[in-house]
Amino acid sequence: MGIQILPPQLANQIAAGEVVERPASVVKELVENSLDAGATRIDIEIDKGGSKLIKIRDNGSGIPKDELALALSRHATSKLHSLDDLEAILSFGFRGEALASISSVSRLTLTSRTAEQTEAWQAYAEGADMAVKVMPAAHPVGSTIEVVDLFFNTPARRRFLKSDKTEFTHIDEWLKRIALVRGDIHFTLTHNGKIVRNCRPAMNEPQYLQRLTQVAGRQFADEALRVECQHDDLRLSGYLQSPWSTVLTDTHYFYVNGRLVRDRLVNHAVRQAFAQKAEVEQPGYVLMLDIDPHQVDVNVHPAKHEVRFHQSRYVHDYILQALQSALEEAGELGFERPFEPSSPQIRDEASLSETGAQTQTEHHAFELQSPESKTHSTWNEASRVDTSRAETSRESRIDSPLGERTRDIASARPYAGVQSNAYGSMAVPRESRSGSAGESRARAELPSKVAIASYGELLQTPSYSVQDKPYQPVLAMPAILNGQYWVLAQGQNLSLLPIQSVALATRSHEVETKLATGLIGQPLLMPVSIAADTDWPALLEEHETLIRQLGLELTIRYQQLIIKKVPPYLRDSQLAKVIPEWLQSLRFEAPAPNALAVWLAEQSLTGFTSAADIWAAYCQLTEEKRQQIADKAVSLPWQSWLEEQASE
């Protein structure tokens, strides 16, 4: 048999094997045509899972009479006219294959009318003969396409269809995905005469959140983090699953210029952004990327499920930085805003924590010692006892699932995960389901009368100086107030020491010590690329020693700054933002070592840090350094407050 050109009918049926996989594929192609026509309302009617009837009705621009027959021909389209158009595709369809392929395996009727026409026209095609009949019809401006008896002339394909319920589930799932990215469109979906889905236009964010709730579920919509980031021609928007949520979800939707695609690059960026921040392996997301159409190729997959970015690494790094920024901002908001429990259960726990803090203030067992004021050695014995108790409590909290959950929820606000009761032991668990249970737990954790009396005697013990005894740091961590301050006692004086300032001071000291010998750079899994300024090559050459000392590996190639290695203190920072800002500062003068240490410390403290770890680092500092930090404590005039209360 010699080589010959296939008949159009056979070629269309072969193409239908790629385009028309199942009824959901037909719905996808026809709805996308309606969207390309500028429709604002699309009604979808399905009968028997789509095997009997698929009917799409829209109010788009319509098709002129003389183009109806041509619309059902293969490789006929109004969306492309030149090779340049193929390199910058913004429409859903562009190959001109869908209608011809669908009509070759079904009985297709296309009715349409444009605004310029006074009457509508209808085109009918059936099966392999592909003969198109055009006749007058009644129809408003827009189009209606009916696909009847799908695969009627290909019995083998029809036998591979699943049950009506399964096929309709695929249709509904695809509609949910397109409804998320096209919130301005009114979609209705009917199955066997019953309205299954009615997505009204979402013209503002509250309305869009309602649509998001319909598609992704209420829990995802209520806990999702908003993403909004723009840089040059790239814009990323959408929603991320909360990193503190442990609920598994199948909401993994990514859109490029409004087109739903599957991309491993995006999945990798999401997993990397959520690394060590989420309980689930694959967090849910609804992300929409707007990019210059010249920078992406959508003509790489028969069903258009995949795309290829011209600068895939740049896009990956951009998405990664945008997601990391959203997660960091969520943590910062949690730190700046006092914790306000939303449920009665958590409110009860918060009140119990406050009660414990008040008890600490009145009968505090810990004291920050200074060279000027030393307490009796009995004090150190009490501290050691409480230290073992606190350590045992922390171990039990970490080992138990309950403790992990409490810590993760509090991680939205740094240091809140280590809130303690009157003696620095475990925070009140979230599983306190009733007021009586909470009260019994509070009574169990409050100090006994004997302990109160003992601590009262200690507070009354006069202080004295021990000049020949070396300074010993307190081993037990002080009580925490509101998740942000340590409550320190010096004699009968109380003061508040900001935990954040201690964290910054201890981390700065650590970094400055290591800077003397140079930081060790850690290679990035995916190097970060940034558009380079013209003077950056000179800056990199001038400050080469300093850059190497910081553990950075920066190169410039094709006018792009490539970040290959960073010190561990910059590992979780927004490199695409932090490094350019630092290079900008080098244009004026090289920073001093202490300024560099503070900068690196600030970048490394953007996430959750345990107050216990901060206190342990504080105790390792020298006496002089500890005293400098302690001087930042704010005194509490609790005695004058008691006098005012007594006078009233």
Curated annotation (Swiss-Prot):
Alphabetical keyword list: DNA damage, DNA repair
Biased composition range(s): Polar residues: 370-381
Biased composition regions of type Basic and acidic residues, renumbered to the chain: 383-410
Region (Disordered) residue spans: 336-443
This protein's GO CC annotations: mismatch repair complex
InterPro entries reported in the protein's UniProt record: DNA_mismatch_repair_CS, DNA_mismatch_repair_MutL, DNA_mismatch_S5_2-like, HATPase_C_sf, MutL/Mlh/PMS, MutL/Mlh/Pms-like, MutL_C, MutL_C_regsub
One Pfam family in the UniProt entry: HATPase_c_3
Lineage top rank: taxon: Bacteria
Gene3D superfamilies from the UniProt entry: 3.30.230.10, Histidine kinase-like ATPase, C-terminal domain, MutL, C-terminal domain, regulatory subdomain
Record flagged with keyword Transmembrane: no
Molecular function GO labels: ATP binding; ATP hydrolysis activity; ATP-dependent DNA damage sensor activity; mismatched DNA binding
UniProt family annotation: Belongs to the DNA mismatch repair MutL/HexB family.
PANTHER family found in the cross-reference section: DNA MISMATCH REPAIR PROTEIN MLH, PMS, MUTL, DNA MISMATCH REPAIR PROTEIN MLH1
Functional summary from the UniProt entry: This protein is involved in the repair of mismatches in DNA. It is required for dam-dependent methyl-directed DNA mismatch repair. May act as a 'molecular matchmaker', a protein that promotes the formation of a stable complex between two or more DNA-binding proteins in an ATP-dependent manner without itself being part of a final effector complex.
Record's protein name: DNA mismatch repair protein MutL
Species whose genome carries this gene: Shewanella sp. (strain ANA-3)
